[in-house]
Amino acid sequence: MLKEPSVRLREAIIEGNLLIVKRLLRRNPDLLTNIDSENGWSSLHYASYHGRYLICVYLIQLGHDKHELIKTFKGNTCVHLALMKGHEQTLHLLLQQFPRFINHRGENGRAPIHIACMNDYYQCLSLLIGVGADLWVMDTNGDTPLHVCLEYGSISCMKMLLNEGEVSLDDNVRDKGNWKPIDVAQTFEVGNIYSKVLKEVKKKGPPLGAGKKPSSFRTPILNAKATFEDGPSPVLSMNSPYSLYSNNSPLPVLPRRISTHTTSGNGGNRRSSITNPVFNPRKPTLSTDSFSSSSNSSSRLRVNSINVKTPVGVSPKKELVSESVRHSATPTSPHNNIALINRYLLPNKSNDNVRGDSQTATINDDGGGGNGGDATIGMGLRKDPDDENENKYKIKVNNGEPRRRVSLLNIPISKLRNSNNTRAED
């Protein structure tokens, strides 16, 4: 048999099922508070006690406890119930929404700070101190939070209260039974720890800002301190929202000759520009293409500034051809043949018109007519017709003039007629 919506809503809050809670409250908006008849707990009380943070947010958005203060039958609020289990995140949310509950007294006249000291929840105590909780508030027996710490053996909360300075200024406060805090210590060990910590605190003196309470809902900002003492750190301590940069850093200074901006190179690659040239070897790749390159290539030949000497006894033509063949058949690497080719190809830096025509290593021979038997090499080499030795060539550089292409349109018509007549006679 299906249970009542109020019971299902209460069970969904305890289990932390936010979807069912939304569905039930959407269908039954009058069940927002849903007071339990056994203990007087509302929906927000159950969510706070079990630490259901998201459900607390949803209930507060719907207006839970907006117009009236809802207490349990024992007089506890949602802040008291959240502190009973030490739910720090839920406590922070409730203190933001209900700041009037900070010093509100519940069961046996205990304030939320008493509940934190009873269970030694020092994280929650630190949050209460930061928002301005009263450190001298008394319950129905006249016990202060320090009395409660020694009575229940909460060492961490006791040290935190003594280090606040305000409590250590007057440690002889008495309750209604005329008992001092040391008199209600749970064990002798707890009493000895209390005496030792109190002596150390009094020896150091009260800390800066002792006796002053925060005037608003803000965590007090302590002195900024870097996490790493040797130098600046991108990670700061929890209590230091701001940190100054330290000049005593052991890290080396970035060299000024290296610019950190990037420039786009050929082919879309991005590289950092460095003042001094640095050679980066490329991965060896076998080139199966000929020495001639396409005229549509975006890269241009540049003159190599390295002075290369031609070996004695070797003609420039043979050296050039052999080096070019070896360059095209072997893995590409920065060696002297590139400097030699650049030296013979482009001695003039301003010559930008020389493209694929000047890079072709083929010999164009006109065959003995027209040009007087001169054989022109595409790279600026001219063959001497008077010398039959192939090892002797004269180097002639094209000074910015593009090489003339050989075409049938360039041959005079008279030569064509003479050749036809000669064939007819034969």
From Swiss-Prot:
Ranges of biased composition (kind: Gly residues): 366-375
Pfam families, per the entry: Ank_2, Ank_4
Keywords on record: ANK repeat, Cell membrane, Membrane, Phosphoprotein, Repeat, Vacuole
Compositional bias annotation for Low complexity: 285-302
Membrane topology: Peripheral membrane protein
Entry keyword annotation includes Heme: no
Region (Disordered): 259-302, 350-392
Range of residues in the leader sequence: none
Cellular location(s): Cell membrane; Vacuole membrane
Segments of skewed composition (Polar residues): 260-278, 350-359
Residues in ANK repeats: 4-33, 39-68, 74-104, 108-137, 141-171
Modified residues (Phosphoserine): S315, S350
GO CC annotation, single: cytosol
Gene Ontology terms: biological process: establishment or maintenance of actin cytoskeleton polarity; regulation of cell growth; TOR signaling
Compositional bias (Basic and acidic residues): 381-392
InterPro entries linked: Ankyrin_rpt, Ankyrin_rpt-contain_sf
Quaternary data: The target of rapamycin complex 2 (TORC2) is composed of at least AVO1, AVO2, BIT61, LST8, TOR2 and TSC11. TORC2 forms a homodimer. Contrary to TORC1, TORC2 does not bind to and is not sensitive to FKBP-rapamycin. AVO2 is peripherally associated to AVO1 and TSC11.
Miscellaneous comment in the UniProt entry for this protein: Present with 1180 molecules/cell in log phase SD medium.
Protein function: Component of TORC2, which regulates cell cycle-dependent polarization of the actin-cytoskeleton and cell wall integrity. TORC2 controls polarity of the actin cytoskeleton, which is required for orienting the secretory pathway toward discrete growth sites, via the RHO1/PKC1/MAPK cell integrity pathway.
Protein name: Target of rapamycin complex 2 subunit AVO2
